[in-house]
A protein has these predicted regions:
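Active-site loop segments of alpha/beta catalytic cores
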Residues: 1-36, 76, 99-251
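Catalytic domains of carbohydrate-active enzymes, especially glycoside hydrolases
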Residues: 40-57, 173-177
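Glycine-rich loop at the start of a catalytic domain that most often binds anionic cofactors/ligands
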Residues: 32-41, 65-68
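Secondary-structure transition motif
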Residues: 21, 48, 59, 72-73
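Short, polar loop motifs at secondary-structure junctions
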Residues: 56-59, 110-111
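Cofactor-binding catalytic cores of oxidoreductases
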Residues: 23-25, 54-55, 68
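A contiguous, low-structure linker/loop signature
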Residues: 60-106, 118-123
Length: 251
């Protein structure tokens, strides 16, 4: 049983020869400590799946800060993950200015194309992206997003529809190129519980997540849901697998 067969056996609810290992991200320090040049070499040696992230271009680079195609400004990370520093949606009028980066740009899938060519049928090919929540957070800022959910729910819903429609196209494209599954990486919680109320999740996010998951299944792929924190009742969706960083507790 090779790595691909091992992972797919688990997703088909059968017993493999051993537990497969997959991971969405590894610190550069760990990668280098194991003598690998990059994350993909590390995954090829030690994991049963190759996880590749969607790629967005850097449009402005001012040393410690850079801006991507969404108009979000980030601060360069000391470790692995950059953090948004400036959010382009500051007020209700800014919602109308949102232009979602196109889904059909080949640049989005550069790493995926290479992974499929090298590992298709040998290891599970996992394409990592978001559905909507963290894009909304980074476009608006967390506090501002919560305020807009209360004050301008219609504008928030229109923004979420733009984002999730775009991400559905991206997921379909990735699967058509040879990805076996989609790893969706929106964080919905911190250690003590969800970031948003069950009512807000059910009203705004659950219907769109359902549409997103259904689109992946209809395209023949599997869905892995990643989230930091204790997601509580948010975890009831139709996921094939949950990659949860903190213990998940049902109420």
């Amino acid at each position: 049983m090779n790595s691909y067969e091992r992972v797919m056996t688990v997703f088909q609810h059968q017993e493999p020869d051993r537990i497969p290992l997959i991971e969405m991200s590894v610190s550069d320090q760990i990668v280098k400590a194991f003598g690998c040049q990059d994350l993909y070499e590390f995954q090829s040696k030690y994991y049963d799946g190759i996880t590749v992230r969607i790629a967005y271009r850097t449009l402005q680079d001012d040393g410690p800060f850079y801006q991507d195609e969404w108009g979000i400004t980030y601060k360069y990370p000391q470790d692995t993950t950059g953090h948004s520093y400036h959010h382009p949606i500051q007020c209700p009028d800014d919602f109308k200015k949102l232009v979602v980066p196109t889904a059909d740009d080949p640049y989005r899938y550069n790493y995926l194309e290479k992974a499929v060519k090298a590992y298709k049928g040998k290891k599970a090919i996992i394409f990592s992206t978001r559905a909507m929540f963290l894009w909304a957070v980074e476009l608006c800022g967390m506090e501002n997003l919560m305020v807009q959910i209360a004050w301008e729910p219609q504008l928030v819903e229109e923004m979420l529809d733009k984002i999730v429609d775009n991400q559905i196209l991206i997921a379909r494209k990735a699967l058509s190129m040879g990805a076996d599954m989609i790893l969706e990486t929106d964080d919905y919680a911190f250690n003590t519980g969800p970031l948003i109320s069950p009512a807000a999740f059910d009203a705004l996010f659950a219907p769109r997540l359902t549409r997103y998951v259904d689109a992946i299944h209809e395209a023949g792929g599997y869905m892995i849901k990643h989230s930091d924190g204790n997601i509580g009742s948010h975890g009831y969706m139709k996921y094939a697998m949950i990659n949860n960083i903190r213990p998940r507790q049902r109420p």
